[in-house]
């Protein structure tokens, strides 16, 4: 179930802004990660050091240093939204801010913990933390236009952290950054052609914004190539398939569940996600050894079954039944989700050298 804008909030003394409690954690909300810092510090970058140094030089230029500056278009823009659009847009801001802030925390901690042992890697993470903090702050400032803001300090201490081995961090964050690029640029291009659907001026910033996401994805691409065991062999192929499926399925189920936001922009959530998935899958073939067969009708048929199961789970949550009864009612839907994910995972993947031969 996606996060909602209706959570507890507390007023900030002497301010018109209310501090909003974080949305309840679910399988669809952004995760906070930690990893093995010693293993990261010990990584040998020499197999692809030249490319990593070139990417770090790009980070140093900080192309968007002066991009995230609010202008007069924000004045009164929040008051122009009807209540339903306002609600779904605040949900979008909250989820996006949380996601960007989780990236900041991970990258910042990595840069701090490996600085002395792996300075090039630490510097890259420091630059990416700068970008993510800038994004999160800009989103949180937009929330204040609606009289709300996230307490990012409280978020840091209250969220549970998921431990991932470094290679799993690489898979997950690479996909997150590349998906972020395609999500932002797709919305920007659509609103360029349909300016009447631009419900808030923050979307004017998405063209440059998405380039940060793209550069971050390129960094993880280069880092995996410096650690070739992450993208070679049977285990790597299986893990790449797993992360592709997990990330695509989560995004699709979440976006269809909150399709009203995309409708407010004049987009169809399903069509939007299909484009983002297709483009990300294509990008992923540049580094992953296999990609998913997203053109196979079975793929989206399976995702639709997950959507239906998620809707059924949300319906159970909305009832007044006692917790044990809810648990029993949810059980068959959880089992069905697990079986469907297994079926999708077992679909034959496409070898990247066959899917995208021009880049191998």
From Swiss-Prot:
It catalyses: Mg-protoporphyrin IX 13-monomethyl ester + 3 NADPH + 3 O2 + 2 H(+) = 3,8-divinyl protochlorophyllide a + 3 NADP(+) + 5 H2O. It comes from the Bacteria. One of its GO terms (biological process) is light-independent chlorophyll biosynthetic process. One of its GO terms (molecular function) is magnesium-protoporphyrin IX monomethyl ester (oxidative) cyclase activity. Residues 1-21 are annotated as: Disordered. Keywords: Chlorophyll biosynthesis, Iron, Metal-binding, NADP, Oxidoreductase, Photosynthesis. The keyword NADP applies. Its EC number is 1.14.13.81. Disulfide bonds: none annotated. It holds the Pfam family Rubrerythrin. SUPFAM superfamilies: Ferritin-like. Pathway: Porphyrin-containing compound metabolism; chlorophyll biosynthesis (light-independent). InterPro entries: AcsF, Ferritin-like_SF, Rr_diiron-bd_dom. Signal peptide: none annotated. The keyword rRNA processing does not apply. Its cofactor is Fe cation. Catalyzes the formation of the isocyclic ring in chlorophyll biosynthesis. Mediates the cyclase reaction, which results in the formation of divinylprotochlorophyllide (Pchlide) characteristic of all chlorophylls from magnesium-protoporphyrin IX 13-monomethyl ester (MgPMME). HAMAP family: AcsF (MF_01840). Belongs to the AcsF family. This is Magnesium-protoporphyrin IX monomethyl ester [oxidative] cyclase. The lineage of its organism: Bacteria, Bacillati, Cyanobacteriota, Cyanophyceae, Synechococcales.
């Amino acid at each position: 179930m996606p996060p909602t804008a209706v959570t507890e909030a507390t007023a900030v003394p002497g301010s018109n802004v209310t501090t909003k409690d974080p949305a309840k954690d679910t399988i669809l909300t952004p995760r906070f990660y930690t990893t093995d810092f010693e293993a990261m510090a010990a990584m040998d970058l020499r197999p692809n050091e030249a490319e990593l140094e070139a990417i770090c030089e790009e980070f140093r230029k900080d192309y968007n240093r002066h991009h995230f500056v609010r202008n007069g278009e924000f004045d009164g823009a929040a008051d122009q939204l009807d209540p339903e659009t306002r609600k779904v847009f605040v949900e979008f801001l909250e989820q996006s801010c949380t996601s960007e802030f989780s990236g900041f925390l991970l990258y910042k901690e990595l840069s701090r913990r490996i600085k002395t042992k792996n300075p090039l890697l630490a510097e890259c993470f420091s630059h990416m933390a700068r970008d993510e903090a800038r994004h999160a702050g800009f989103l949180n400032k937009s929330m204040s236009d609606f009289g709300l803001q996230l307490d990012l300090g409280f978020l840091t201490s209250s969220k549970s952290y998921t431990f991932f081995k470094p290679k799993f961090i690489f898979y997950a964050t690479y996909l997150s950054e590349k998906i972020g690029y395609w999500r932002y640029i797709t919305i920007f291009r659509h609103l360029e052609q349909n300016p009447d659907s631009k419900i808030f001026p923050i979307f004017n910033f998405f063209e440059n914004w998405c380039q940060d996401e793209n550069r971050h994805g390129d960094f993880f691409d280069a880092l995996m190539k410096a650690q070739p065991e992450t993208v070679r062999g049977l285990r790597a192929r299986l893990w790449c398939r797993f992360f592709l499926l997990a990330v695509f399925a989560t995004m699709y189920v979440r976006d269809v569940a909150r399709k009203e936001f995309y409708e407010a922009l004049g987009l169809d959530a399903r069509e939007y996600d299909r484009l983002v998935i297709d483009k990300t899958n294509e990008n992923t073939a540049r580094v992953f050894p296999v990609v998913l067969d997203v053109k196979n009708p079975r793929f989206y048929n399976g995702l639709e079954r997950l959507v239906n199961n998620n809707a059924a789970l949300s319906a159970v949550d909305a009832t007044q039944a006692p917790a044990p009864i809810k648990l029993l009612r949810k059980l068959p839907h959880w089992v069905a989700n697990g079986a469907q994910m297994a079926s999708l995972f077992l679909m034959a993947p496409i070898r990247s050298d066959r899917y995208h031969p021009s880049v191998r």
